[in-house]
Amino acid sequence: MRKQTDLAKVKQTALALLSTEINETPYSPMIVKHPFTDTGVSAIPDGKGGVEMIDLTEDDAQLRWRQSMARQIDKADSAYAIYMMVIKPYALTFLKFAMPHLSREDMSQILASAWTRSEAPHQDVNVTVNQLLRMFKPADPTCLMEQGEYIQFKTLDDTVTVYRGVTPHNAKSVKTLSWSLNQETAEWFVHRFGENGTVYEAQIDKKHIYAYFSGRNESEVIVDPSYLTNITEVQDLSSDFLLSQE
């Protein structure tokens, strides 16, 4: 990994993503899909100190928006500043392509933010589980985690019991990176949309755990799923869980 970030190369990466097609949806122009915007109604400087609202489904407006975004990217003074221009669903995609040009510190900080900003990062169709592992394994844990998280991470036992809740929607995503130290958290994921699913318990050696995140009260650990052992279904506690919410 690079000792220093090559900011010029990171900007080139961002500009390449900026040049990709804006994909319309049934709700366009209000909702579109693109690494730098999720709405087709955007504001750009009008050259008079104000802003102008434009429709990105129109070719001329789209060109002007791309030019405006390119100027912002060019003015950015850090890789993190560029990363923050990318919308959440594409955060890990940006990191995947920018990673060869990032220092270990910058990569770790962006990875931590991208992971915790995303609703279901391990289900990102643009980034595979193996690619995510190639991000987490070389990351600097002191940059990846907050101080309190790092302290908790260091105190984990040599072998750790972890839990994961899945629903019919993600029933095949058992051996994946994201697990919890807390069974109640896994239960919450099973029932949060009124669904019934399954909670799994497994063991994993600490050396195959790469991060601990306490945000959103999830007690989340990032693991190499190939080293999970003794994966078993936990006794169905759904009725007890639902009663506890009344």
What kind of region is each of these model predictions?
Residues M1-V162, T167-L177, Q183-E246:
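Conserved NAD+-utilizing ADP-ribose enzyme module
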